[in-house]
């Protein structure tokens, strides 16, 4: 499985389908763990990584908001957990706020070398990953700041329907909203459904899906089996 990471100078743009910046193909295997919205909770993030490793995930992806803009301790430890475990990650709105604060000279009680390393880490994060018709993003999979600030789940299917109309993604895995939720496109109809805890979701070829994984800070993560084409919600 080939995956492409999209990086870009982040600007506000009213066009949701702006062309992405640079493409860097990566190789993924069949079992993928997904984590989102750990918000500086290093214990919960580590527990998610361990649970997904126990499930023999070949790759683990963090879907953004690794940090919390209001929590400035353990920043370097969080970066170490991500890098030491070879976690792929996309940028969330809280990560962007931390990045901008550091760029604007906020010391955050960090050594200069740690501050520089955290800045480099945040700058390196992709806005989203794609692999064929599968996408991993913090929220909406478009190339602008607005995309990772605006939630897909607003209690209706409006934003999900827009994504289904404007993209070719068969599967989108994202975070931002902290409640696990499924949006399903079937024959032009979009539905909003809870994700069951005990029953794996089997993907159908004639349907499209948006999976909101849920917050690791609240004990949620997910497991994708590409060979079986199933998704499992995992509670810590």
Report residues per predicted region.
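Non-catalytic terminal accessory segments
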Residues: 5-6, 161
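Core catalytic region of metal-dependent phosphoesterases/phosphodiesterases
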Residues: 6-12, 25-31, 35, 40-123
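Short, acidic/polar N-cap/turn motifs at the starts of alpha helices
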Residues: 22, 124-128, 200, 221
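Binuclear metal-dependent phosphoesterase catalytic core
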Residues: 26-29, 190, 194-236
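Active-site-proximal beta-strand elements of phosphoester/diester hydrolases
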Residues: 30-39, 133-140, 210-214
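Structural motif
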Residues: 59, 171, 208-211
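Divalent metal-dependent hydrolysis catalytic cores, especially in the metallo-beta-lactamase
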Residues: 65, 177, 181, 215
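Conserved catalytic scaffold of divalent metal-dependent phosphoesterases
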Residues: 73-74, 79-173, 177-187
């Amino acid at each position: 499985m080939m995956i492409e990471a999209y990086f870009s100078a982040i600007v506000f743009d009213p066009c949701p389908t702006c062309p992405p910046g640079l493409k860097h193909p990566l190789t993924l295997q069949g079992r993928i763990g997904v984590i989102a919205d750990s918000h500086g909770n290093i214990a919960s993030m580590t527990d998610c990584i361990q649970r997904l490793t126990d499930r023999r995930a070949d790759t683990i992806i963090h879907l953004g908001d690794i940090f919390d803009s209001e929590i400035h301790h353990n920043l370097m430890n969080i970066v170490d957990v991500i890098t030491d475990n070879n976690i792929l990650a996309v940028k969330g709105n809280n990560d962007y706020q931390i990045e901008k604060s550091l760029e604007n000279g906020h010391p955050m009680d960090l050594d200069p070398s740690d501050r520089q390393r955290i800045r480099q880490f945040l700058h390196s994060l992709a806005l989203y990953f794609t692999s064929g018709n599968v996408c991993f993003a913090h929220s909406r999979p478009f190339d602008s700041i607005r995309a990772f600030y605006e939630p897909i789940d607003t209690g209706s299917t409006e934003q999900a329907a827009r994504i289904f109309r404007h993209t070719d993604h068969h599967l989108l895995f994202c975070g931002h909203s902290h409640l696990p939720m499924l949006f399903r496109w079937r024959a032009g109809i979009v539905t909003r459904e809870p994700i069951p805890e005990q029953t794996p979701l089997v993907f159908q070829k004639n349907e499209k899906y948006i999976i909101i994984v849920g917050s690791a800070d609240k004990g949620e993560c997910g497991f994708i089996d590409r060979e079986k084409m199933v998704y499992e919600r995992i509670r810590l």
